[in-house]
């Protein structure tokens, strides 16, 4: 069920602007002028506008299926190229772009309205084809156009049959038999999604919510109630790690899930995947990793694993770990009488792996790995090791890496109790790691401490690994790079050497975009930790992109090894053809609410371009609030100044300034004759301060209760400012749940008329039953062209027999 509560802003009066003293006025003018010059220079330096991925909806699919999806893109053009990192999967555009989309009401008012604006996407229809041999998990993808390449984002390949949320429903959506995955979207603020499910057999049911891993802004609040309304599950993803929860369900009892954002926020980008399975969820395992090629008895811990009861239980299974040297994990599926658990990831290690004994006093043989848990909240564990002088050991406490909620700290003490080393988080994770150079032969104490407060349960484990610090190298590079035609791109490769490795590091690309070349030999010199690769793009190259893989082949010891550096999307781009600047630089203009503001824009044409320009809203706005919007506007050839129409809704607050930033799109042929769309972001911003409206529409119908199939006569009153005397048409605006079920003939009020009545006819359809909110809109044209709009809302309860 979709539920939302619209907030209607109260009328606000304009604040009086006091006259400033001349000296202060001059100082402020000087400051603003200087700031404008700084912003102008900054904007000029960063004018290239590369695309970004917003979302995929539905956000994935099951292996062996083809799914029609919607791609939400920020600053996309019609000529996008799509790249999936798994070459088995096909993602293709099948339809044109939507207009730039502004988030629908309700809007934030008051303090929250001062927060950052959601990006404005365009949506593209696309088709996702996932072959049957693709394993479940996250799949990375990127996009590119003639303006650059995007960072990678992800969609998910699932394990269960999939359905899409019914966004038009009025009650909880009934889910089919488990397992099932629901692709959903919290599309508006204050929205709550509701789902209902049953199981034919009592036992554990696992609910998995994936959103943050899809780059969704959703911090989920999830609650499950039984048929009597009792809460049986309540969880909040305040840390942004997504949710996997287990409850004990009774047979044939309807349970209802409610799901919303922690802050009751919502937008098209708030996508999620909700998977329900009849079966338990493994929360921890002992061991967390097994020795390569060996069979270990593994204790699995989770709710109801042994008896199906509502308590933490454990079961033992023998697990044989893969022997292949390039396999580092095993997705293990535990079978239980209540259904299979979700796949659980076990590590595959080259160390001998053990579980810390109950006494927790036995020494750890090194090199080795040990899985344990901490007895108390914020507690510590101690591990005794014997080390020799001159050795260097790599010591890691794994928690986040194995799915544990713990946040660990690692400390080493000598035999005399003196602290020798300590570490907390390392880049990219909350797991601690250190390289310990042993100062003397003897016994050492490794202390693992939890800082999260989530220790004290066997469901929160960790793995300690101690192994010699071997010679090796880890390399990193950016995930995307744009190279303008006829120039050089600079790609910086970073190397982290460990274990004393100092040798040269040869590098090689598997491919490059057409027209892009680099040196025949790419090598990070011995003892150096970085290399800048010059990527030269020919002036006559096409604008194109390619997903390129970089591999390193250093000689470590006596063996040449292969180390993947990563994948980068390289895009050849074209120079800007225009520069847009608002007349008056960063001025703020007063604009009547509910009217169209004609914003003056200055155009500088570059590289000899004289053709038409399409102006549109840029995706990343600043102070863009409460439905401020504009449509595409075509600037004729040769024009150097235009007035761009921006509609300022009547509900915008008069106490806050708003901003609008534009893109200019032009079509230009590249050297190979391919027509590409170049996108240029406006320098500085258009400033708007809403003031009193030119027109206001109200009604005297009150709150009505009517029967299905009836007619409603709604008395209306229209107030106008003296300077606005145009005819006004009044009409009913049906929302997506009312379309085809309600109708009303529009009425027109002449400049002399101040009231009228709209007759609304209801269909005899049960889908209308309940509370309905009807929007009535009045539209007039200022100067015969520019819309002036006012709205009012009528609350109607549709009840059979009324």
How would you name each of these model-derived features?
Residues 1-47:
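Intrinsic disorder/low-complexity segments
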Residues 48-103, 185-329, 334-337, 348, ...:
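Acidic, Ser/Thr/Pro-rich low-complexity intrinsically disordered segments
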Residues 48-187, 258-375, 449-456, 460-461, ...:
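Ser/Thr/Pro-rich low-complexity tracts
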Residues 55-58, 285-287, 476-480, 518-521, ...:
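Surface-exposed, proline-enriched loop/turn segments that connect beta strands in immunoglobulin-like
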Residues 66, 121, 136-138, 202, ...:
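Extracellular Ig-like/FN3 beta-sandwich strand-entry sites
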Residues 86-93, 509-520, 618-632, 733-746:
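Short, solvent-exposed loop/linker segments at beta-strand-coil boundaries, enriched for Pro/Gly
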Residues 115-120, 237-240, 248-249, 426-429, ...:
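Short proline/glycine- and polar residue-rich coil/turn motifs
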Residues 129-135, 248-252, 264, 319-326, ...:
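Short, surface-exposed loop/turn segments at beta-strand-coil junctions that are enriched for proline
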């Amino acid at each position: 069920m979709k539920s939302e509560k619209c907030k209607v802003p109260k009328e606000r009066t304009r604040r009086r602007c006091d006259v400033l003293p001349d000296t202060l006025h001059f100082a402020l003018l000087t400051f603003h002028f200087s700031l404008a010059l700084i912003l102008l220079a900054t904007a000029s330096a960063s004018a290239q506008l590369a695309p970004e991925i917003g979302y995929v909806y539905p956000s994935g699919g099951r292996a062996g299926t083809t799914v029609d999806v919607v791609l939400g893109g920020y600053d996309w053009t019609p000529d996008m190229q799509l790249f999936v990192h798994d070459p088995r999967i096909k993602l293709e555009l099948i339809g044109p772009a939507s207009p730039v989309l502004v988030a629908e009401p309700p809007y934030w008012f008051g303090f929250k309205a001062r927060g950052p604006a959601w990006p404005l996407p365009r949506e593209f229809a696309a088709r996702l084809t996932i072959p049957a041999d693709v394993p479940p998990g996250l799949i990375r993808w990127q996009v590119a156009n003639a303006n650059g390449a995007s960072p990678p984002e992800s969609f998910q390949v699932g394990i269960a049959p999939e359905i899409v949320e019914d966004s038009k429903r009025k009650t909880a959506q009934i889910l089919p038999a488990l397992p099932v995955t629901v692709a959903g979207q919290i599309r508006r603020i204050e929205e709550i999604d509701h789902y209902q499910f049953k199981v034919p057999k009592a036992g554990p049911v696992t609910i998995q919510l994936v959103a943050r891993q899809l780059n969704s802004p959703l911090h989920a609040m999830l609650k499950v109630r039984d048929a009597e309304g009792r809460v049986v599950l309540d969880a909040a993803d305040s840390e942004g790690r997504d949710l996997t929860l287990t409850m004990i369900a009774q047979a044939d009892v309807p349970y209802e899930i409610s799901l919303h954002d922690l802050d009751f926020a919502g937008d098209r980008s708030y996508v999620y995947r909700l998977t329900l399975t009849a079966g338990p969820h493994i929360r921890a395992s002992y061991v967390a990793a097994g020795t390569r090629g060996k069979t270990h008895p593994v204790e699995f811990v989770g709710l109801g694993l042994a008896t199906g009861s509502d308590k933490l239980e454990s079961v033992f299974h023998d697990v044989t770990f893969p022997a292949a040297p390039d396999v580092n994990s095993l997705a293990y599926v535990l079978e239980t009488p209540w259904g299979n658990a979700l796949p659980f990831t076990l590590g595959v290690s080259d160390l001998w792996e053990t579980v810390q004994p109950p006494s927790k006093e036995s020494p750890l043989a090194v090199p080795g790995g040990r899985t344990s848990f901490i007895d108390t909240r914020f507690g510590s564990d101690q591990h005794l090791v014997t080390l020799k002088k001159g050795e260097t050991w790599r010591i890691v406490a794994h928690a986040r890496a194995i799915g544990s909620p713990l946040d660990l700290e690692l400390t080493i003490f000598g035999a005399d109790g003196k602290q020798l080393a300590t570490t907390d988080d390392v880049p990219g994770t909350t797991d601690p790691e250190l390289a310990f150079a042993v100062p003397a032969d003897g016994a050492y104490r490794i202390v693992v401490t939890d800082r999260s407060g989530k220790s004290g349960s066997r469901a929160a484990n960790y793995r300690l690994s101690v192994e010699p610090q071997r010679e090796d190298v880890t390399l990193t590079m950016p995930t995307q790079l744009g190279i303008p035609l006829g120039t050089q791109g600079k790609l910086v490769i970073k190397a982290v050497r460990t274990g004393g490795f100092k040798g040269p590091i040869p590098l090689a690309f598997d491919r490059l975009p057409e027209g892009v070349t680099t040196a025949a030999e790419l090598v990070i010199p011995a003892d150096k930790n970085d290399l800048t690769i010059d990527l030269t793009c020919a002036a006559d190259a096409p604008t194109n992109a390619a997903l390129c893989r970089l591999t390193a082949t250093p000689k470590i010891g006596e063996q040449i090894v292969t180390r993947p550096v990563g994948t980068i999307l390289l895009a050849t781009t074209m120079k800007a053809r225009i520069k847009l600047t608002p007349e008056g630089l960063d001025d703020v203009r007063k604009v009547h609410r509910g009217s169209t503001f004609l914003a003056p824009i200055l155009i500088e044409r570059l590289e000899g371009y004289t053709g038409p320009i399409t102006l549109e809203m840029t995706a990343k706005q600043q102070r863009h609030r409460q439905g401020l919007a504009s449509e595409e506007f075509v600037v004729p050839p040769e024009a150097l100044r235009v007035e761009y129409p921006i509609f300022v809704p009547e509900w915008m607050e008069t106490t806050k300034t708003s901003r609008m930033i534009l893109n200019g799109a032009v079509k230009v042929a590249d050297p190979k004759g391919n027509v590409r769309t170049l996108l240029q972001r406006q320098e500085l911003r258009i400033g708007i301060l809403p003031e009193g409206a030119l027109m206001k529409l109200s009604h005297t119908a009150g709150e009505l209760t009517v029967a299905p199939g009836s007619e409603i006569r709604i008395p209306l009153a229209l107030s106008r400012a003296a300077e606005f005397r145009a005819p006004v048409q009044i009409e009913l605006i049906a929302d997506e749940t009312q379309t085809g079920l309600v109708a009303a003939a529009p009425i027109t009020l002449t400049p002399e008329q101040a009231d009228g009545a709209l007759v609304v006819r209801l269909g005899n359809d049960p889908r209308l039953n309940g509370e309905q909110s009807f929007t009535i809109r009045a539209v007039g044209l200022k100067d015969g062209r520019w819309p002036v709009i006012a709205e009012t809302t009528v609350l109607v309860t549709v009840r059979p027999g009324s």
